[in-house]
Amino acid sequence: MSFGLTGLTGTGLAGLAGLICIGLTISSGFSGSSILIHIHSLVQMHNLGTVYISYYK
């Protein structure tokens, strides 16, 4: 149960951070490839964070 809640919370935070990152990237005028790199980095950070939290609990 706690793992499910952790996953949902992590997904929401990653999604919010992703929107912020995309917004900053577009407003800064970077190319589309850097947006993909930002999204990929966020997904990796989210995966590591979820694994860390689940092991910590």
Curated annotation (Swiss-Prot):
For this UniProt entry, what's an example GO CC term? membrane
**What is its membrane topology?**
Single-pass membrane protein
Which subcellular locations apply to this protein?
Membrane
Q: Which residues cross the membrane?
A: 15-37
Protein name per its UniProtKB record: Putative uncharacterized transmembrane protein DDB_G0285779
Q: Which UniProt keywords apply?
A: Membrane, Transmembrane, Transmembrane helix
Would the keyword Transmembrane be found if you checked this record's keyword annotation? yes
